[in-house]
Curated annotation (Swiss-Prot):
Residues 114-135 are annotated as: Disordered. Residues 124-135 have a biased composition (Low complexity). It comes from the Bacteria. One of its GO terms (molecular function) is tRNA binding. This is Small ribosomal subunit protein uS12.
Amino acid sequence: MATIQQLIRKGRKKIKYNSKSPALGGCPQRRGICTKVTTMKPRKPNSSMKKVAKVRLSNGKEVNVYIPGEGHNLQEHSAVLIQGGGVNDLPGINYRIIRGTLDTAGVNGRIQSRSRYGAKKGAAKQAAAAKSKKK
């Protein structure tokens, strides 16, 4: 344990915390432009083709981001809003796109967790009604 005299001379060492989303630069979200939209296979026990995009952010950094939800309308040069928070089974993906903002459409027919996927309240019921009319 340090003596009072040692603390006066040097002080306590500050603990540095590493950010999990350094490309955001301390901001909660960042705007960016899609440069590439692809799919990616997840890690070992899972199996699918997860939708991923490469995005150039407004601060000049390029990051790989996950596109959540079923289906999307993104293509090259689409403007997107991203936030921190990766996907457990996709290595190197530490950001995700916010659905329902800028050029990104919300998920159609979504009933639960609508705010996460940019789905409007009545849209799910209208989609279900349209499906039943087709049958």
